[in-house]
Amino acid sequence: VLLLARANDNYDRSLGWQAHSLEVISQTRSLDAALARAEAALGRFAVGLQKEDGRVYEQQWGLSQQYLTLLQRNVRDNPKQAALVKKLTDELGRRGEQLGDAALSANYRQTVAAISKYNAAGHDAALIRIDRLLSDLIRNERTILAERNRVAASDRANLNQAILLFSLLGAAAAIIAIAA
């Protein structure tokens, strides 16, 4: 019974780690999407000076920061991933200042300055670094997930063996009881 319980616990733990990896991948993609929506809204705000676009920019940028916080929390047990998230946090801090300058100009209806700052931000090398960091996070987590899938399959096989052994022992005990 203890063998069966331990095999079941190992399998449950493996499934939990798989779910954790999928969550990290999902949060990374959600962060990327929120950043893209924020930058698109800022572009519209810089050109059209519509306050609603400015609000969408602020909301999406804030959402991206929430995803970043979740990501920091979820990778803290993995030094390699935590280091990537730290670099990403630093890059996004600088990016936020850059985009904030463009948003401020748009807020004060300085169209030329807003467009110019937004355009400069669009050509900044930080975009490539941020994209690379996001891709690295996902690639690393997929590697971790593949290993976790292998462990889960092994744990599932161990659980099946324990169930089979437990069933055979139960059948043998029943036969002995009937024969006696």
Please place each PLM-identified region on the residue numbering.
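Hydrophobic alpha-helical transmembrane segments of multipass integral membrane proteins
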Residues: V1, A34, A38, R95, ...
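Short loop-to-helix capping motifs
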Residues: L49-K51
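Amphipathic alpha-helical segments and their boundaries
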Residues: V1-A36, N74-L92, D155-L159
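Transmembrane helix-loop junctions and nearby membrane-interface residues
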Residues: A5-Y11, F45, A102, A171, ...
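Selective recognition of signaling/oligomerization transmembrane alpha-helices
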Residues: I144-A180
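Heptad-repeat alpha-helical coiled-coil/4-helix-bundle sensor or tether segments in soluble regions
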Residues: A34, A38, F45, G54-E147
